[in-house]
């Protein structure tokens, strides 16, 4: 599938596309959609509920040598970050 890409913080990233939760790979790196420096790494996916599950992306980043983690709804995560496809 062809995805639209742009250079964000010196990296080629997929823009204006929302991946299905099962397409988001652990270990993938995502650039900040606002163009600011840095990236986050997907650590995992959390699923809550069974009939209509709520899925969150668990991600991390480093700041001043310290690792931080957070989680966001899969849609909100992709509104803020773009999948890096080339460094």
Q: Could you describe each region identified by the protein language model?
A:
Residues 1, 23-26, 50-56:
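A short, compositionally biased
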Residues 2-25:
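Mixed-charge, Lys/Arg-rich low-complexity intrinsically disordered regions
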Residues 5, 29, 58-60:
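Residue-level detector of beta-strand face positions
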Residues 13, 38-40, 82:
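Small-residue-enriched segments and motifs
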Residues 35, 39-70:
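Basic/aromatic-rich interaction segments and small domains that mediate binding to polyanionic partners
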Residues 63-87:
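Intrinsically disordered, low-complexity, charged/polar segments
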């Amino acid at each position: 599938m062809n995805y639209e890409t742009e250079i964000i913080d010196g990296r080629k990233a997929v823009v204006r596309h929302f991946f299905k939760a099962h397409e988001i790979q652990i270990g993938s790196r995502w650039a900040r959609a606002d163009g600011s420096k840095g990236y986050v790494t997907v650590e995992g996916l959390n699923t809550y509920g069974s009939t209509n599950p709520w899925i969150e992306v668990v991600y991390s980043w480093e700041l001043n040598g310290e690792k931080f983690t957070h989680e966001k709804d899969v849609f909100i995560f992709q509104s803020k970050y773009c999948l890096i496809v080339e460094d």
